[in-house]
Regions:
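Bacterial N-terminal signal peptides
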Residues: 5-14
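Targeting-peptide/extracellular-domain and disordered-appendage signature
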Residues: 15-216
Length: 216
């Protein structure tokens, strides 16, 4: 297969600086995902140079980031398919102290998986949540590895490509190898600083790779 693929890796930060409610013994993932970030997190305020391969990985000083893949593929029989795999990281509190329990987490992860079978007019989707504790979810470098349960994004031992995407559910599965493309990196907005409004910090650092050869 060789079709269009768009890869986006970025950091998105909310502009609101309202403090979160005091910590309690329980947390609802949906409420935390919708809450304003702790004001102690770093914010996207000005243009900064990207530092690769380090910037392909996680940035726990920031509240939110994601690794986003979407593409159009054709199988050996000519059938058309579309897919999306996105892993989000959401910080609960700034800083990264050594936890006193392997189950204690300062990060939450959310995943979206979708596959469209164009010929059959069918669309399949799944969503996952997990904490960055006890090996359930997380992000690492050298090489790049972002995972949420059995869903994962893996980079090459040297550099980023080839990338390996792997995710499955009871109904669908995705297993793709992504090679480097011929087009240069695309930096959104002002040299990678993508402003969402005039409010300071309501912005993200955002870059993309497009038209990458993909097979699987």
């Amino acid at each position: 297969m060789l079709r269009l693929l768009l890869l986006i890796a970025g950091i998105a930060l909310a502009a609101c600086e309202q403090p979160m409610s005091p910590a309690s013994g329980t947390i609802r993932v949906d409420q935390r995902m919708a809450a304003a970030p702790d004001p102690g997190f770093a914010r996207a305020l000005e243009v900064r140079p990207f530092d690769f391969p380090r910037d392909h990985g996680a940035h726990p000083d920031y509240a939110t980031e994601w690794w986003y893949f979407t593409g159009n593929l054709r199988d050996a029989g000519g059938g058309l398919f579309g897919y999306q795999l996105t892993l989000f990281r959401v910080g609960l509190r700034p800083g990264d102290p050594i936890p006193d329990s392997r189950w204690r987490a300062r990060q939450l992860y959310m995943g979206h998986l979708a596959i469209s079978d164009i010929g059959a007019a069918m669309h399949y989707r799944e969503e996952r949540f997990g904490r960055a504790a006890a090996g359930l979810a997380g992000a690492a470098m050298d090489p790049l590895h972002v995972w949420l349960g059995p869903w994962s994004i893996r980079g090459a031992d040297q550099g980023l490509f080839p990338l390996r995407l792997s995710a499955w559910t009871e109904d669908i599965a995705l297993d793709l190898s992504i090679g480097p493309g011929s087009k240069p990196l695309v930096a959104q907005g002002e040299n990678g600083l993508s402003r969402k409004s005039a409010a300071p910090g309501n912005a993200s650092y955002y870059y993309s790779f497009t038209r990458l050869p993909t097979g699987g």
